[in-house]
Amino acid sequence: MPNPLRLVISGGGTGGHIFPAVSIAQEVQRRYPEAEIRFIGAQGRMEMERVPAAGYPISGIPIAGFQRKALHKNLSLPLKIWKSLRLVRQHLSAWQPHAVIGTGGYVSGPTLFVAQRMGIPTLIQEQNSFAGWTNRLVSRRAKAICTAYPNMEAVFPAAVTHQTGNPVRPAIAQMLPITEEARRAAKTQLGFDPERKLILVLGGSQGARAINQAVESAETGWRSADHQVLWQCGKFYVEALHARLGEAPGRRIQAFVDDMVQAYTAADIVVSRAGAGTLSELCCAGMASILIPSPNVAEDHQTHNALSLHERGAALHIPESQAFTSLAQTVEDYLAQPEKLEALRSGARALAQPNAASDIVDHLQTLWTWKA
């Protein structure tokens, strides 16, 4: 190809920003196998490892986020921003991309800002129901904005805003409604009793202290009620929990869940944080879920995400401050009432958008002037 399609994608800091970026890249490459796709990430953040592992080159810039709890750490921020803007301009001048995509996180701000001032078409992918300040800042010059939630025209220019959903892993996007036979089979494959209810706990790869504390308080009672627990506690908590609790029938504690399709298929109910990517997966998988959003994220966006599903009958919402006292009984109540579980599953499936990556690339294709 004498003139390959060239794209730059920027986003990171958390998996919720990285995975959509990689999914978009994979969909572009599926359509245009010779496309040249490069990433820009924040130095020292997880995208600098995750993106190369997915097969794409990445260049780091020294950008950092604003520290609300340690203001003295912001003294070097202006210099980091200046250096980042300069590096982005150098990269874009050298690469000459036909379009630039931002999937959020503070690293996408300088990338989109510079691209827009260089006249390069930009697309924003906003995962949350409450837009972050970075995406708000650069939205006025964006050529397309793809959102996961409806009614985002209140904060973004309506003419270029499209609700597409968040990209999820293809295996999860393709999941069919789970039958009881499939659920029992998945429990057996995981080593659980197929006839007993299974509670899946997801605290994220880093873990969530409040969720772990609430589950530790509740799980003995759950198992006494003949329920089982697959507990993904995060890498920072797994050793301490194993040391403190040891082994017990009907309970498995692990840092990660490798096969999420199998775990979702086996689960009768899910307890989870409310990150945008996880919620999109829960909807595609048709899960009955209890969401405990982290209050320690920018603009409290997880609470907005959780409430968006809760208000549409697609999930339950428990504030973190109430998790320790409310989680155990809420799980018990719903496991005892299959019709309530099925209502949540139906509500989640109604919000699923399994074709998000494809829809985003459809909009992306309208931006560039490139021809093969």
Each language-model region and where it sits:
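Conserved nucleotide-sugar phosphate-binding/catalytic loop shared by glycosyltransferases and other
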Residues: 4-12, 34-80, 164, 237, ...
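Donor-nucleotide binding loops and adjacent catalytic segments primarily
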Residues: 45-46, 50, 54, 178-272, ...
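Structural loop-to-beta junction motif characteristic of Rossmann-like glycosyltransferase folds
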Residues: 56, 120-121, 268-269, 286-294, ...
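Active-site-proximal region of nucleotide-activated glycan assembly enzymes
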Residues: 57, 116-183
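Glycosyltransferases and closely related glycan-assembly transferases
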Residues: 87-101, 108-123, 136-144
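Acidic donor-binding loop of glycosyltransferase active sites
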Residues: 97-99, 265-279, 287-288
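A short, well-ordered alpha-helix in the C-terminal region of glycosyltransferases
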Residues: 340-354
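C-terminal alpha-helical cap of glycosyltransferases
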Residues: 353-372
